[in-house]
């Protein structure tokens, strides 16, 4: 973990709620009749939010909240999500809750988020995908991962300077790239931008100084990130929705410039000289190129 002089690698504080909690929650609250019906998703969510989590779980959740001072992601981890031939990744909900001073408020948000993830197993789209893949919905089991969110707070919003998705195989190598080099997709803000197919930067870790999207000015102006996601830092204890992104903000990159979070990751387009310069300068459009990280070695991301 300490192989790099200018970087500390830390694992977010994480807790897993195993599938037995899901089984007990469903059986104790007699939710299967409602969950397997054809009622709207909103009514399913409402029924799940009104149900009670196992009492033995609450003390553990309180202990987790005592040591986490960051927002928390509440992620699905079902038996079918990692199926080799018919993966369910991306089908179920992932909620994020902000950090607020009141532990009682955070506990209420955390409990509701867990219930929301459970409810998402039985939403209309989940059932349709289950049918299309010839799986049986009442055999699905849901674990839940609670994980500290990395990032920084800027006023009433929270987001990381860098988020990314790494792939071990590069299916479309360009130039000197090799398939075994893998690829990384980088973005400013929360990783939802990448997962949802938004504009991000595709990089080969073996060749961080050769990025197709920034190889020419016209391409960079057209193909680099223009908006990013941040978590709204206000309590949502009475406002959970079927849409798990209901408390996320989609903001223009200019907002990040005002936050001061673009240092080392942005370049500036000079419309007078018609050039792109690495770094932040007055005037001109800011482009998310990760130049300081990829080309200047400010942070050894490609090595990590």
Spell out what each predicted region is.
Residues 1-55, 290-298:
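A conserved helix-loop-beta module that forms one wall/lid of the active-site cleft
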Residues 1-3, 52-304:
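Conserved mixed alpha/beta core segments that line enzyme active sites in large multi-domain catalysts
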């Amino acid at each position: 973990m300490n192989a790099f002089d200018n970087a500390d690698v830390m694992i977010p504080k994480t807790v897993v709620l195993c599938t037995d909690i899901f089984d007990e929650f469903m059986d104790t609250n007699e939710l299967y009749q409602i969950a397997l019906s054809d009622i709207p998703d909103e009514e399913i969510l409402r029924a799940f939010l009104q149900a009670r989590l196992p009492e033995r779980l609450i003390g553990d959740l309180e202990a987790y909240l005592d040591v986490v001072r960051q927002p928390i992601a509440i992620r699905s981890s079902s038996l079918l999500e990692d199926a080799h031939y018919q993966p369910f990744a991306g089908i179920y909900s992932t909620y994020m809750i902000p950090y607020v001073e009141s532990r009682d408020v955070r506990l209420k948000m955390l409990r509701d988020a867990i219930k929301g993830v459970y409810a998402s197993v039985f939403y209309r789209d989940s059932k349709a995908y289950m049918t299309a893949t010839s799986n049986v919905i009442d055999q699905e089991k849901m674990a839940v991962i609670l994980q500290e969110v990395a990032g920084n707070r800027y006023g009433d919003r929270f987001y990381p300077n860098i988020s990314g998705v790494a792939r071990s195989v590069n299916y479309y190598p360009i130039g000197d790239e090799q398939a075994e080099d893998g690829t990384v997709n980088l973005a400013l803000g929360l990783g939802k931008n990448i997962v949802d197919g938004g504009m991000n930067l595709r990089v080969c870790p073996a060749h961080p100084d050769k990025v197709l999207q920034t190889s020419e000015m016209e391409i960079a102006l057209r193909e680099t990130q223009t908006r990013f996601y941040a978590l709204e830092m206000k309590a949502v204890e009475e406002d959970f929705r079927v849409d798990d992104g209901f408390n996320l903000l989609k903001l223009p990159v200019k907002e990040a410039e005002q936050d001061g979070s673009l240092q080392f990751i942005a370049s500036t387009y000079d419309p007078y000289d018609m050039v792109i310069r690495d770094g932040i300068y007055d005037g001109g459009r800011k482009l998310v190129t990760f130049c300081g990280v990829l080309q200047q070695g400010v942070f050894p991301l490609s090595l990590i």
